[in-house]
A protein has these predicted regions:
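Signature for the C-terminal beta-barrel architecture of outer-membrane proteins
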Residues: 219-221, 232-420, 482-484, 492, ...
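C-terminal structural cap/anchor segments
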Residues: 406-409, 413-525
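Surface-exposed loop and membrane-interface regions of Gram-negative outer-membrane beta-barrel proteins
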Residues: 126-146, 155-222, 233-235, 335, ...
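Outer-membrane beta-barrel "beta-signal"
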Residues: 532, 568-582
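Membrane-embedded beta-strand positions of outer-membrane beta-barrel proteins
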Residues: 105-111, 168-172, 225-227, 261-263, ...
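N-terminal periplasmic/intermembrane-space "pro-region" immediately following the signal or transit peptide
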Residues: 1-164, 171, 398, 402, ...
Length: 582
């Protein structure tokens, strides 16, 4: 049987309304025949909040001198002169006058205590122990040094976006040093001065005017000139020249800082002997350095910077002999016939620093060519032709960095052939293979002349046979060096960092050593340098940093042949350093 369709429901009969129908407010607003709809009423989320200003009242504004003082108007920060972390006029956080004239004050206390033991010759005229009959005496020494560095910088410009337009900087340094040794005629040429020395000095390490004379692009590429006593480093690791000389330097950038250049002339200043700081009370040396270099960022791959450099060193210090503050002759060095000499040398170099993927890489290559008017050993003029190469590769594994280091400096093959093939720098300060935590780099080991000529200089890696790294002249008749090293940097904790290095050292050629010591064949084995260091930052920041290190040189056969009378004690160097920064 067919199904019937469902019945349609019938509406209920309407009843007469008892009153007007209820209509929502929003429908009333929409049904208004004329005018704009009123804005919706926003309920108060927080009844205690401050009501917004009325649109019918005039706007109340308080003018302020500049945007840096907005925090003062809002009472967000109370400036304290001793607080370097919040807005502070002494730290260049806000203008001291005008709209963009700033002042920046930095104070650093650098304290060093350094016990060490190294081969030490006995005094020539006298000795601390009258019954001594050896060539070498007691080698224990210690030095305490305090440097108070005050940096004053007055500059104009908005440094957030571009370099300063003007900068005037002055950096005085107050130094105190105390040294004690076990043998006379080390701290002073006069043996009556004993075995201790207290000294102090006030130096000017920086005093220059910097002027940005041109902006060359919308990305603030610039040309700048700096005149006065200024810091300069020739390459990434300080292999060739790092100093605070007086001079003129033009520098700038192009192509959004991808190209950088330096063109400069510098004249080296005399140094205070016991502090190593500039002595502006003396006439500058007749030692000129002309530099031109060009940097390219993101060379070949992003993150690697390449530098090409040409340096001309013109040293014409032939007027007279020069004695240091302790009475020792440093120019010319007391070796050979010790007559005054001059030399002209050009360094052609290429340097790189950065990373290829996860591999951190730094490399340096130099070729030195020039002329020495008087070789002190052969007693005639000589041509300079020497090479230098260094590389360091490292990789990070989480909190651990593993490094490998290689350095080669050519050595002189024959001191009498009219050629100088031993590489020497102008004034080096290498940050390489452990740097100043290494015994070989940190300590100057005496060689001949009662210590008047050292095997290598203080904070130097090259065995240059110079009287003084700071006050002496370059010497290209030297044995050269081969260094192979490995190292580890470990970030143990946010406060703690540990560093360890092992470097194996060889001379490249010992002919110059044999000539100076009047000694037969000397082995190339120099020794093994082992060092460990730790850094502690109690507040996780760089304002308080404590560094400590210990290093030993395990003598090789060649070192033992040079210092056979120096006893069987292993040379060592210990360093404790506290740096406080404001």
């Amino acid at each position: 049987m067919a199904q019937q369709p469902p019945a349609t429901p019938q509406p209920e009969p309407a009843t007469a309304p008892s009153g007007p129908a209820s209509v929502p407010d929003d429908r009333i607003i929409q049904q208004r025949p004329m005018g704009k709809p009123l804005p919706p009423v926003i309920p108060l989320i927080d009844p205690s909040q401050v009501a917004p200003p009325s649109p019918l009242l005039p706007r109340e504004t308080v003018p302020i001198p500049d945007r840096w003082r907005l925090t003062d108007q809002l009472k967000l920060v109370n400036q304290r002169w001793f607080d370097p972390y919040n807005p502070n006029e002494l730290k260049g956080d806000r203008p001291i006058h005008g709209e963009d004239w700033f002042f920046n004050l930095s104070v650093v206390s650098d304290t060093v205590f350094e016990p060490r033991r190294l081969p030490t010759p006995i005094g020539a005229q006298s000795t601390q122990r009258p019954q001594s009959n050896d060539q070498f005496g007691y080698g224990k020494q210690s030095t305490f040094v305090e440097n108070l560095i005050v940096s004053l910088s007055y500059l104009k410009g908005d440094t957030t976006f571009k370099p300063p337009e003007y900068e005037f900087r002055l950096v005085p340094v107050i130094n105190y040093n105390y040294t004690t040794v076990k043998e006379v005629r080390l701290v002073n040429i006069d043996p009556r001065r004993g075995t201790t020395r207290r000294d102090g000095f006030v130096a000017i390490q920086e005093a220059f005017v910097d002027y940005e004379y041109r902006i060359v692009s919308e990305r603030y590429d610039f040309d700048d000139v700096r005149v006065g006593i200024q810091p300069f480093i020739s390459d990434f690791r300080g292999f060739l020249f790092q100093d605070q000389p007086i001079g003129v330097r033009f520098f700038g950038t192009r192509d959004n800082n991808q190209w950088q250049y330096n063109i400069g002339w510098f004249r080296r200043l005399e140094k205070d002997t016991n502090s190593g700081l500039n002595d502006i009370t003396r006439t500058p040396r007749h030692d000129d350095v002309f530099v031109g270099n060009l940097y390219r960022q993101d060379f070949m791959v992003p993150g690697f910077t390449m530098q090409g450099i040409v340096v001309y060193n013109r040293n014409h210090e032939t007027a007279q002999q020069f004695l240091d503050d302790n009475g020792f002759q440093v120019r010319p060095a007391i070796m050979g016939d010790a007559r005054p000499r001059s030399y002209d040398v050009v360094y052609l170099g290429a340097n790189g620093d950065g990373h290829f993927g996860r591999w951190n890489t730094t490399a340096s290559l130099y070729w030195a060519i020039g002329h020495d008017d008087h070789n002190q050993i052969s007693q005639r003029s000589a041509n300079i032709n020497a090479f230098f190469a260094a590389a360091e590769v490292s990789r990070d594994f989480d909190w651990l960095r593993v490094r490998g280091s290689l350095l080669y400096a050519s050595g002189d093959k024959d001191p009498y052939d009219g050629k100088e093939n031993g590489f020497d720098a102008i004034l080096e300060n290498p940050q390489f293979a452990g740097a100043d935590t290494s015994f070989w780099i940190r300590q100057a080991v005496p060689l001949i002349g009662g210590g008047g000529v050292a095997l290598s200089g203080r904070n130097a890696v090259l065995p240059a046979l110079r009287s003084s790294k700071d006050q002496g002249q370059s010497n290209f008749t030297n044995p050269g060096l081969l260094l192979v090293g490995i190292g580890v940097d470990a970030d143990l904790a946010p406060r703690w960092r540990a560093i360890a290095n092992v470097n194996q050292l060889w001379f490249n050629n010992t002919s110059s050593l044999s000539a100076l010591r009047n000694q037969g064949d000397i082995d190339r084995g120099l020794g093994t340098d082992v060092s460990v260091a730790v850094q502690y930052r109690p507040l996780f920041i760089q304002n308080i940093v404590f560094n400590a290190s210990a290093a030993v040189l395990i003598p090789g056969k060649g070192f033992k042949q040079l210092y056979v009378a120096g006893g069987s004690n292993t040379p060592y160097s210990i360093l404790a350093n506290l740096v406080l920064t404001y």
